[in-house]
């Protein structure tokens, strides 16, 4: 079995390739060619923390694996990662353990790739200004993926802890050469954006501003019914709400459950799964006036396909630590 660390994965990743693999996984899922149960969610430590168990089989892609992740929001106060995890791949023919990959970096990359795919199909082609609300680790992968699919000229950042936003602005400027600005008011930040990303652990909406025509939103933070990043009116007034999995999104996120309970949105008003848009079964953005929202909760098959990509790259480059059971 090959063990692949986060640092080793970092040197293997080509974001454009990861976006392609994520799109392939989404297409297979929406075509019902995978077995991807709704993930198990286990609250622990007085429900402050969450363990997520995410298995998947993709028959056509010959991939089998499981991801186990813990989300501990309080870790950031003691300088530790809020997301920890592992991904295990099994040999598709023999069922033997194939690889064990550090899971928090992989999660960041696949989260970014999902937003990259959504942005490719749903954002305006001439989108130039990106707003990111929440500047934790997940925002790094999302920014990189959006830069891969759109020619972004300006980045606007908002974070409750302002110094973290400034640190992220420096990261964006140094790594990507993009001008990045920290705003004190999330509503002002949202008002100026062509593409909005929310990646927080918020239980109440992170902005209240009415969305501008033509904007695209990637909402990736809310993964529990008790969590809500977007104001209900944003979901209600969007022209297209898109998800990875209708079943999972309706089961897991307050971003949809709350407006449904308030009578502002109906479950059958979800426009499409992202895989249906990739395959051409459903339309993506159709004009520059549409408001589009991609509500992401994650999807195990994407993790497994990205893990398989990293495993194959590791074999090619002789990277990783081989261990015997």
Swiss-Prot record:
EC numbers: 1.5.1.49
Any one GO cellular component localisation term in the record: cytoplasm
* UniProt keyword annotation of NAD present: yes
Listed A to Z, the keywords are:
NAD, NADP, Oxidoreductase
Is NADP there in the keyword field?
yes
Could you tell me the superkingdom of the organism this chain comes from? Answer: Bacteria
Q: Which GO terms describe its molecular function?
A: oxidoreductase activity
The reactions it catalyses are: L-proline + NAD(+) = 1-pyrroline-2-carboxylate + NADH + H(+); L-proline + NADP(+) = 1-pyrroline-2-carboxylate + NADPH + H(+)
Q: Which Pfam families match?
A: OCD_Mu_crystall
The task this protein performs is described as: Catalyzes the reduction of Delta(1)-pyrroline-2-carboxylate (Pyr2C) to L-proline, using preferentially NADPH over NADH as the electron donor. Is likely involved in a degradation pathway that converts trans-3-hydroxy-L-proline (t3LHyp) to L-proline, which allows B.cereus to grow on t3LHyp as a sole carbon source.
The cross-references to NCBIfam families, in alphabetical order and at most eight, read: PRK08618.1
Concerning its family, UniProt says: Belongs to the ornithine cyclodeaminase/mu-crystallin family.
UniProt protein name: Delta(1)-pyrroline-2-carboxylate reductase
Q: What species does this protein belong to?
A: Bacillus cereus (strain ATCC 14579 / DSM 31 / CCUG 7414 / JCM 2152 / NBRC 15305 / NCIMB 9373 / NCTC 2599 / NRRL B-3711)
